[in-house]
Amino acid sequence: MTVGILALQGDFREHEEMLRRIGAPTLQVRLPKHLDRVERLIIPGGESTTIGKLLAMYGLIEPLRARVREGMPIWGTCAGAILMAQRIADGRADQPSLRLMAVTARRNAFGSQLESFEIDLPVEALGGESLRMVFIRAPVLEDLGDDVTPLARLEDGRVVAARQANMLATCFHPELTSDERMHRYFLEM
């Protein structure tokens, strides 16, 4: 099973390294033809507006949507979660996006880069066990659709991880820790 990692911008190398550590073959995805060679895809953190523009420039938006509709598992971390959201609360209407998951993403929900933080929180998908979460200019997920399951919440109740069928979104960066559990969870989806 080859895991594609969108490699247009952002921290795709960290995801690639994590997957290599756990023995999963990877392929950097930059063009639509690369999608034919992967069974699942990770959209990394980075800058959502830039990644969205590059998705459009390289003709990846429609092929990606089609593969996800066919059942390919997809995981967006931070900026990737924003790009997967059907709605972006504070985004521009013309911002290129995948608009796949029935959630609203609120960008930079914690403020600027200076307000970045780490916290340990329980994750439903991991049997309620705690996971170290790194938040860097992170979004939160709001207005979850009926078929979207929240997987992790902050102490104030805001959702920071969710799943809808074959789609996983995390507002934090598991790839920036040494904990492999979220990557293993994605491989089992």
Swiss-Prot record:
The keyword Hydrolase is assigned to this record: yes
Top-level taxonomic group: Bacteria
A GO MF label: pyridoxal 5'-phosphate synthase (glutamine hydrolysing) activity
Coiled coil: none
One annotated Gene Ontology cellular component of this protein: cytosol
UniProt catalytic activity: aldehydo-D-ribose 5-phosphate + D-glyceraldehyde 3-phosphate + L-glutamine = pyridoxal 5'-phosphate + L-glutamate + phosphate + 3 H2O + H(+); L-glutamine + H2O = L-glutamate + NH4(+)
InterPro entries: Class_I_gatase-like, PdxT/SNO, PdxT/SNO_CS
Pathway: Cofactor biosynthesis; pyridoxal 5'-phosphate biosynthesis
Annotated active site: C78, H173, E175
Pfam family, one: SNO
Record GO biological process: glutamine catabolic process; pyridoxal phosphate biosynthetic process; pyridoxine metabolic process
Protein family according to the UniProt entry: Belongs to the glutaminase PdxT/SNO family.
Function: Catalyzes the hydrolysis of glutamine to glutamate and ammonia as part of the biosynthesis of pyridoxal 5'-phosphate. The resulting ammonia molecule is channeled to the active site of PdxS.
Quaternary state and interactors: In the presence of PdxS, forms a dodecamer of heterodimers. Only shows activity in the heterodimer.
Protein name: Pyridoxal 5'-phosphate synthase subunit PdxT
Gene source species: Roseiflexus castenholzii (strain DSM 13941 / HLO8)
